[in-house]
UniProtKB/Swiss-Prot annotation:
Any one Gene Ontology BP term: translation
Single GO MF descriptor: structural constituent of ribosome
Keyword tags: Ribonucleoprotein, Ribosomal protein, RNA-binding, rRNA-binding
Family: Belongs to the universal ribosomal protein uL3 family.
Protein name in the entry: Large ribosomal subunit protein uL3
Amino acid sequence: MNKGLIGKKLGMTQIFAEDGRRIAVTVVEAGPCVVVQKKSVAKDGYSAIQVGLGAKDASRANAAQIGHCKGAGAGVFTHYRELRMDNTDAYNLGDVIEAAVFEEGDLVDVTGTSIGKGFAGVIKRWGFKGGRSSHGSRFHRAPGSIGCSATPSRVFKNKKMPGQLGNEKVTVQRLKVVRVDAADNLILLGGAIPGSANGVVLIKDSVKAKK
């Protein structure tokens, strides 16, 4: 993976292809991002760059943040993400990465935070079937038995149970770049991506693009 940047999800719309097909797309305001750090195999054990998005008032940043971004010479940022690279020689501190880094037809992976839906039961959270609604049934939406008694006398880890639904890191793979508006730093991606409007997402080359 050698391309990527941070963006902000604006919402979904639809466009028409040249053959008349209607395509649902997600509009992402991609960048401009600034390279604030480079990592090398010799020093850090892997090769990567760190990019920042969204200017932040220096008076609201601590000394560590200011010092971290000093080498880039572009101020302090609100959001930071790291991009693994095969080779970082093409990037220098302070370089600006914009939407034009991607082209129409590219396949990308998009990572974001899914919409939080609060505490949910097993039917909504995991898709359990549930029990009968009538005929004397006293079992409707409960999870039922969650383990054995004497052996093993415990509940196994990762048991599907009620709990927090959403608000977790989600990656959608192999989305197609339908259109790129370099003037306004907009990227139109085919399909849906995680998160709500104005949510921060990471767009990078698809790891399965060549498969």
